[in-house]
UniProtKB/Swiss-Prot annotation:
Record-stated family: Belongs to the DapA family.
Name of the protein in its database record: 4-hydroxy-tetrahydrodipicolinate synthase
Reaction(s) the record says it catalyses: L-aspartate 4-semialdehyde + pyruvate = (2S,4S)-4-hydroxy-2,3,4,5-tetrahydrodipicolinate + H2O + H(+)
Pathway: Amino-acid biosynthesis; L-lysine biosynthesis via DAP pathway; (S)-tetrahydrodipicolinate from L-aspartate: step 3/4
EC numbers, comma separated: 4.3.3.7
Keywords, comma-separated and alphabetical: Amino-acid biosynthesis, Cytoplasm, Diaminopimelate biosynthesis, Lyase, Lysine biosynthesis, Schiff base
Species whose genome carries this gene: Karelsulcia muelleri (strain GWSS) (Sulcia muelleri)
Transmembrane segments: none
Residues flagged as site, Part of a proton relay during catalysis: 46, 109
Amino acid sequence: MKNINGIGIALVTPFNKKGEIDFISLEKIVSYVINEGVQYLVLLGTTGETPTLKLKEKIDIINCVKNISQNRIPIVLGMGSNNTEDVLLTLKLIKLDNFEAILSVCPYYNKPSQEGIYNHFKTISENTDMKIIIYNVPHRTGTNINLDTINRLINNRDNIIGIKEASGNIIQSYNFIKHKIKKDFLVFSGDDTIGLPIVLGGGDGIISVIGQAFPKELDFIYKFAYKNQVNKAYKLYYKIFKILNLVFKEGNPSGIKTLLKIKGLCNKYVRLPLLKGSKTLEKKLYIEYNNMLKTQ
């Protein structure tokens, strides 16, 4: 298995004006982030607007990204549902060769108990040899996975290798890092706004949204963090701080697509029920982006 740590990119799914997948822009983004030094890719996650994609579109995206990446860096595939049986079916329908792991979100809407969450991931792990990264994002799912459940899972299932922790609760993240019962269990930040302190506190990296706009900047930020050069890391972090806050003002991925449009990487079209970033947001991002360029 290739090494999954450092900076992973939660890829957008670019669309054209007709709402069709813009594969040329997808190829451009994938090539850009790989060439700029990110460590791995994550596709078909929240940022990729996966709930709006048909199965054939998902397969086409997978093939496109594989073709461009050419095994240069690891790829993690998003595969989650609030129906456990749906995940098991998807495992059978999609070819998982050349993927290093799957990223599977905690069941949403149903609001299962911790025992339900445990059995959901236990069942998935029993039905695949793939490595599994749990995705905890309670502000979207309505359910938060706790430390005891994580430790039960990793104690009983060797192929559950990590968690993308996006609760926004840095204390919870630190608890996962400090009190996990397996040292090699990976804890990734799933939140760009607190990714740096999580890595400085012992986390294994970040699955980033903003990184597809600033891959080189993030590469430097986190390399400084791993070397415990805190001042240098934060100096670079604060250069993108205003942009980072703006990107999430109108939701994800509307904001990041607006920024990617400014950078010439893709259009800002999204699929309903999301709306594309407003002209006001685009103007603010344009100003801050140009201000940032002036300081380099």
